[in-house]
Amino acid sequence: MVELGVLLATGSGVAKDEAQARKLFERAAEAGNPRGATNLAALSAGGGAPSDPVKARALLARAAETNSAEAQYQLGMMTAEGIGGPKDDVAARSLFERAAAQGHPGALERMGAFAQSGRGGPQDSSAAKAYYEKAAALGNEDAKAALKRAECPYVIKDKRGNFVSNLCF
């Protein structure tokens, strides 16, 4: 059911039909399938179906309870930004931590950022570096960039204050 929904949502090998994909994802989510819930949340968050971030967040919360790393990561992102509900850095960090413990590359990168800045919990540079290294080893480009910035902490900005490059010793 979820697989067909993905094909319909993306138009991969079949005519694109987001409305039918949504129905399939809804049935899967209602049956307790975490992938159905995360895919439905992606559509509800604005990925082609009517945008409903409150519903997306509720669906992700339900899927996150099944220990779905992807749902925990997506819910963490929404919680960190206050999309579909209140912003809560402590709760977001907890969600990222749960997904990172399962090896989710995006969650590992976010844990690195949260640990580096002290957002939602204690600041810990060595933990941040460890999270970034794990995420980078899994191919996360943001983590690779964060590690590079740590090696080259001096920044060049243009006249508008936009990042141009890092300087290294």
Residue ranges and their predicted role:
Residues M1-T10, A37-G46, Q72-E81, G85, ...:
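Hydrophobic face of amphipathic alpha-helices that form TPR/SEL1-like repeat modules
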Residues T10-S12, A31-P34, G46-G47, E65-S68, ...:
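Short helix-capping/linker turns of helical repeat alpha-solenoids
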Residues A15-R27, G48-L59, P86-L95, P122-Y131, ...:
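Structural signature of tandem alpha-helical TPR/SEL1-like repeats
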Residues R27-A28, R62-A63, R98-A99, K134-A135:
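Canonical positions in the second alpha-helix
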Residues N33, A58, A130, A137-L138:
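Recognition helices and adjacent regulatory flanks at domain boundaries
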Residues V54, A61-R62, T66-M77, V90-A91, ...:
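A charged, solvent-exposed segment within the mature domains of Sec-exported extracytoplasmic proteins
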Residues K134-F169:
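Terminal, low-structured helical/coil segments at or just beyond the last alpha-helical repeat
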